[in-house]
Amino acid sequence: MDIRDEILKLKKEKGAIILAHYYQIPEIQEIADYVGDSYYLSKIAKDCEENIIVFCGVKFMAESAKILSPEKTVILPVMEAGCVMADMATEEGLAKLKEEHPNAKVVCYINSSTEVKALSDVCCTSSNAENIINNLEEKEIIFLPDRNLGSYIQEKTPDKKFILWNGFCIVHEAIQKEEILRLKSEHEGILTVAHPECSKEIRDISDFIGSTSEIINFVNNSSNKKFIIITEEGVLHQLRKNGEEKEFYIPYGKMVCRNMKMTTLKDLYESLLKMENKIEIDEDLRLKAYNSLKNMHKLGG
């Protein structure tokens, strides 16, 4: 029997649901019940009826699912699949910032550890950050860990004062302006579409900025035929499915998050078969972190 059939058989037997982020390999996206960005998947994990969630993504995503649904079994097929940016934010550093800015609200990107979420007032994703910041009464915002998303939201909410953590996504940060200008010069009429995790100099020369789901929606609804896609190349799988006649260009021909690409069909099969790699979170810590995620769903729309 084909491994895909084995996975579907196991999923049915165990009553599990498979969630996959847009940055996963195409084979994982194809077998998942739901494919989406962090915010969409967190809502599915919170509201789904299934008691077993297999989260094909990175650790902070699976942890967020467990924080929101402690009664459910949450499995991360590859426990080593972490997030470099999430690891840049520390509890100690955040605690110090909170002391220095006692009146500030702490907004953490969902790409954060459970410990950082526990010290934050509200979580956000790239698709709901602006909404959340606008819904906060406080004028002073500690934003972490992504300085690029933070500066982007700061531009959108000029009445707020931001204290930005100096973190970044190594995949988006690596893109240079010269490469984008080169692609633009080679392809007349091409549209540049970027994720807000990109630096300001990249955002400033882009035609559209949005989360992964917003990028996909923009491209799908555009009559344009050529696009520079400045985010992890996993989104190309969905874009090509929906727009076969369209051309897509990735800077340097490659934008890969190694952690997102770790999970294979074999890993997914093994984790379901053996019910291994379960996410466990101390209950006191979970309750503290739950607050920030609960507030995200309340304020994020």
UniProtKB/Swiss-Prot annotation:
Cofactor info, note text: Binds 1 [4Fe-4S] cluster per subunit.
The record lists its disulfide bonds as none
Query: Which residues are iminosuccinate-binding?
Result: 21, 38, 109-111, 126, 195-197, 212
Q: What are the BP-aspect GO terms? A: 'de novo' NAD biosynthetic process from L-aspartate
Any one GO CC term of this protein is: cytosol
Which reaction equations make up its catalytic activity? iminosuccinate + dihydroxyacetone phosphate = quinolinate + phosphate + 2 H2O + H(+)
- Chain positions recorded as [4Fe-4S] cluster binding sites: 83, 169, 257
According to the UniProt entry, its GO molecular function terms are: 4 iron, 4 sulfur cluster binding; metal ion binding; quinolinate synthetase A activity
Provide this UniProt record's keywords sorted from A to Z.
Answer: 4Fe-4S, Cytoplasm, Iron, Iron-sulfur, Metal-binding, Pyridine nucleotide biosynthesis, Transferase
Cofactor(s) it depends on: [4Fe-4S] cluster
The EC code for this enzyme is 2.5.1.72
Which pathway does the protein contribute to?
Answer: Cofactor biosynthesis; NAD(+) biosynthesis; quinolinate from iminoaspartate: step 1/1
Q: Which Pfam families match?
A: NadA
SUPFAM superfamilies named among the record's database cross-references: NadA-like (SSF142754)
Q: Which domain of life is it from?
A: Bacteria
Where is this protein localized, as stated in its record? Cytoplasm
InterPro entries tied to this protein: NadA (IPR003473), NadA_sf (IPR036094), Quinolinate_synth_type2 (IPR023066)
Name the enzyme's class.
Answer: transferase
Question: What is the role of the protein in this entry?
Answer: Catalyzes the condensation of iminoaspartate with dihydroxyacetone phosphate to form quinolinate.
Q: Family, per the entry? A: Belongs to the quinolinate synthase family. Type 2 subfamily.
Q: What is this protein called?
A: Quinolinate synthase
